[in-house]
Amino acid sequence: MESLWRAETKLPQFSRLEEDLQTDVLIIGGGMAGILCAYFLKQAGVDYVLVEADRICSGVTGNTTAKITSQHGFVYQKLVREFGPDGARLYYRANEEALAAYRELCRSIACDFQEKDNYVYTLNAPEKLEKEISALVQIGARAELAQPSALPFPTAGAIRFPKQAQFDPLKFVNGIAGGLKIYERTAVKSFDGKAYRTDRGTIRANKTIVATHFPLWNKHGSYFLKLYQHRSYVLALEYGLQLDGMYVDESGTGLSFRNQGDLLFLGGGSHRTGKQGGGWAELEQTARIYYPGAQIKYRWATQDCMSLDGMPYIGQYSKQTPDLYVAAGFNKWGMTSSMLAAGILRDLVQGKQNPYGELFSPSRTILRPQLAANAVEAVCNLLTPTKPRCPHVGCALKWNAQEHTWDCPCHGSRFGQDGKLLDGPATGDLSREK
């Protein structure tokens, strides 16, 4: 169950931290967001160190479908409603700038970067289509209605964003990570003030960026209330069909399509982590129906942090932690979100203003309908009298029969059949008692 990217690209390896050290900025987390933060800080001449508990890109970055787009489902009608046209326009501009930054960097990196139109389609909700295009017109986005002809089933229409992009994320990381100051297999266990303890050394940092997918600490920021996680699945098919762009269903449980070379990526089967969902079985059935004879070359799964309002949390970790920063809640759009997070955090740690800082601030209101849903989920699973329990906050774990893992429906931690930690926010393995 290895992704295409992991199978075909070998990343540079970095040593483990074996001593105490001091730095201006500590970056915790070696996925796309953390690595881009390190790259930008190096370019700015800022002293930094990045630490990764495993290997760089061993998490979501190595399992993405790697679409680079400012079209994040039918999100703009929601953003106009909740943040007004100005807020929605800022969100669009921030993501367009992220796309432009990738385009510029990829001029000198061999990472299969290709411009592609992106389509978000709907199967049966033309009214949502009309509301979305109206919101896009209102904010001045480059978008138009379209009738997708490349999909193997009828739709009620789509919205097209021209000149978006796709790439190979690990080849891209290969192009920028080689000269960065990185320590792998170096997990931060705790912190006291500005001292961060790892297995074999203490790092003293003036400022710290937490880019660990799900933030590490519950004490500040209430991220255990503000985030939940989703599983998604991908099949890479040998079929010989070349699409005219990238496609994704506006429904959170729908299908996505794109090519990578001669392969066709079929994504979907999504569900909240710890809940039942279609998984690979759903995708295999879809492939048999629409692409008969297709051979499965690769299959993999990924996990995404979802915010309460559809926008990432980027900025100061909490109001009580002035020198601690975070990037989290990318809502399945990690490529553009990683780039814009790196740009915002590069400025903030240097004491500079950023035009998008206020919009993405983690301290914005959490009074959203999803908050109540998250709270109900947590209470129900805390009261469920079964074992094993998640070491994060004690929720009852659910068995994932497709992936043979124990999954937490509260916050998304995952454990292997042997109890080994696979995904946070939990920071340790399951106890032997079950």
Mark where each language-model region is:
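Extreme N-terminal leader/targeting segments of oxidoreductases
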Residues: 1-25
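Flavin (FAD/FMN) cofactor-binding and adjacent substrate-gating region
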Residues: 2-7, 74-80, 103-172
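N-terminal Rossmann-like FAD-binding beta1-loop-alpha1 element of flavoenzymes
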Residues: 23-50
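Glycine-rich FAD pyrophosphate-binding loop
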Residues: 43-63
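Helical element adjacent to the flavin cofactor pocket in flavoenzyme catalytic cores
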Residues: 135, 158-207, 211
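Flavin-dependent oxidoreductases
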Residues: 191-193, 197-259
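Flavin-binding catalytic cores
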Residues: 240-243, 262, 271-306
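C-terminal catalytic lobe of FAD-dependent flavoproteins
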Residues: 251-252, 280-282, 293-371, 386
